[in-house]
């Protein structure tokens, strides 16, 4: 059923895929990295200005393999991993409407954790997918989407100061598609290599 939905809609909203305890660990990890090894997006390559963002983090690259069978099962595709990218969103940040580059043919965004202040108890900061469907997530939920085809974006993060949301992006290409093998591992020797850090 999910494979048919993905084929028709070009995205899937899946709940409770990543274990909650693992989500807590990743969230604490990302926040600690933000505090001790701050890596902001800056300049012309910035997609979310000043957000702590990391390409090819070793923990995330490990999870790229963990998620692979889930993504293949729900899309019906045979996939090759390309790369990962995680980001800590803070109040006022916006993700502009966009499509992704070839290495993001099949993309997955995972919500690992959040903390909201000065908002209503039912507030959730979600992602829009073309044509304008808002998807909200709890920790462990994932959205699979065709990153090169489906526009996606986030409105301004309107929660209060000290709020955060930790999201990570796990990218793959179809082994039977137009971007394989050229974009395998995002043109790196393999998963985990810290190359092309400016890519998103």
Segments and roles (model prediction):
Residues 91-153, 161-168, 173-188:
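Catalytic core of non-heme Fe(II) oxygenases with the double-stranded beta-helix
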Residues 66-70, 85, 107, 111:
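Generic beta-strand or strand-like secondary-structure segments
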Residues 13-14, 80-81, 144-145, 169:
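A structural signal for short, well-ordered beta-strand segments and their strand-loop junctions
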């Amino acid at each position: 059923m999910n494979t048919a939905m993905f084929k028709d809609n070009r995205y899937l909203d899946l709940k409770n895929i990543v274990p909650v305890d693992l989500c807590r660990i990743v969230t604490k990890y990302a926040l600690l990295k933000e505090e001790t090894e701050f890596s902001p997006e800056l300049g012309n390559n910035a997609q979310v200005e000043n957000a702590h963002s990391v390409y090819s983090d070793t923990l995330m690259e490990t999870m790229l393999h963990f998620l692979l069978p889930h993504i293949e099962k729900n899309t019906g595709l045979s996939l090759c991993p390309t790369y990962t990218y995680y980001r800590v969103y803070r109040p006022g940040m916006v993700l502009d409407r966009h499509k992704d580059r070839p290495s993001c043919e099949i993309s997955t965004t995972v919500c690992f954790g959040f903390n909201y202040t000065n908002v209503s108890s039912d507030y959730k900061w979600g992602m829009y997918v073309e044509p304008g469907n808002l998807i909200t997530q709890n920790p462990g939920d994932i959205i699979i989407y065709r990153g090169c085809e489906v526009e996606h974006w986030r409105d301004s993060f309107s929660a209060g100061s000290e709020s955060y949301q930790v999201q990570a992006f796990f990218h793959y290409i179809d082994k039977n598609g137009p971007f394989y093998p050229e974009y395998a591992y995002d043109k790196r020797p393999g998963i985990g290599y810290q190359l092309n850090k400016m890519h998103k």
